[in-house]
């Protein structure tokens, strides 16, 4: 099964692409945002760790019903980089475990492809398990405009803090196999999606062969090794600049 890593900066249109892949092409979606909400529900281990770490920093961390005040938590961590790293350190292991379980489920169901929809695909090194990576991008001006329209409660400073906390568009493009430019119309975006799907669709023969241990192991190993090599080359290039 081909795992397609889908990522993109905030308010670039990744969710639009994910819905199109699900509705038009019937691809199963492993949604990291959805999983991230589930693992921080009251009673979950990640929830307890977040409360312990942030309760003295964010007075309104919890809502009346005991759930996390996601707006207050987000505003805080996007203004405090070290705390954003701490939050990611708490949530990422739980999110990874849940994602791997879901990917395994779709593999056993016999799907030819599944989409791993992750905002921090490269930051979390999850691209290493993907056969193909796709990034959705747009201009920073359009990104800011869309973010403030989608989240009117954010000030311009808060919105810019969220954008600046993420990987740059240039780095994301350099690490992606395919780029979807979302600066124009929805029709244009859909045409780009159609083109990418046609290029990456695995054959039925390959899908069947991957259920045989030798072929499956070689296929998986080649993906991981190629991703690690690509990352190593990119790190060398960055160091040389």
Curated annotation (Swiss-Prot):
Disruption phenotype: Lethal. Residues 3-211 form the DPCK domain. One of its GO terms (molecular function) is dephospho-CoA kinase activity. It catalyses: 3'-dephospho-CoA + ATP = ADP + CoA + H(+). ATP binds at residues 8-15. Its EC number is 2.7.1.24. Pathway: Cofactor biosynthesis; coenzyme A biosynthesis; CoA from (R)-pantothenate: step 5/5. It is found in: Endoplasmic reticulum; Mitochondrion; Nucleus. The keyword Nucleus applies. GO terms for biological process: coenzyme A biosynthetic process. Keywords: ATP-binding, Coenzyme A biosynthesis, Endoplasmic reticulum, Kinase, Mitochondrion, Nucleotide-binding, Nucleus, Transferase. Its main location: endoplasmic reticulum. One of its GO terms (cellular component) is nuclear envelope. The keyword Nucleus applies. Belongs to the CoaE family. Present with 1660 molecules/cell in log phase SD medium. Catalyzes the phosphorylation of the 3'-hydroxyl group of dephosphocoenzyme A to form coenzyme A. This is Dephospho-CoA kinase CAB5. The gene is CAB5.
């Amino acid at each position: 099964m081909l795992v397609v890593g889908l990522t993109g900066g905030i308010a670039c249109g990744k969710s639009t692409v994910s819905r199109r892949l699900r509705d038009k092409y019937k691809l199963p979606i492993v949604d990291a945002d959805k999983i991230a909400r589930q693992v921080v529900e009251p009673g979950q281990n990640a929830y307890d760790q977040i409360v312990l770490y942030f309760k003295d920093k964010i007075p309104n961390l919890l809502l009346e019903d005991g759930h996390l005040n996601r707006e207050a938590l987000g505003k805080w961590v996007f203004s405090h980089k070290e705390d954003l790293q701490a939050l990611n350190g708490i949530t990422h292991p739980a999110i990874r475990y849940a994602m791997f379980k879901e990917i395994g489920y779709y593999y056993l169901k016999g799907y030819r492809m599944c989409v791993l929809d992750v905002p921090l695909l490269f930051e979390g090194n999850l691209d290493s398990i993907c056969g193909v990576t796709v990034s959705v991008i747009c201009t920073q001006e359009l990104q800011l405009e869309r973010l403030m329209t989608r989240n009117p409660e954010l000030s311009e400073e808060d919105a810019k803090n969220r954008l600046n906390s993420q990987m740059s568009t240039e780095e994301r493009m350099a690490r992606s196999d395919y780029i979807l430019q979302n600066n124009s119309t929805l029709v244009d975006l859909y045409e780009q999606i159609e083109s990418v799907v046609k290029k990456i669709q695995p054959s039925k023969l390959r899908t069947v062969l991957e259920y045989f241990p030798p072929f499956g192991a070689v296929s998986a190993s080649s993906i991981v090794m190629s991703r690690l090599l690509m990352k190593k080359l990119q790190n060398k290039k960055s160091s040389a600049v």
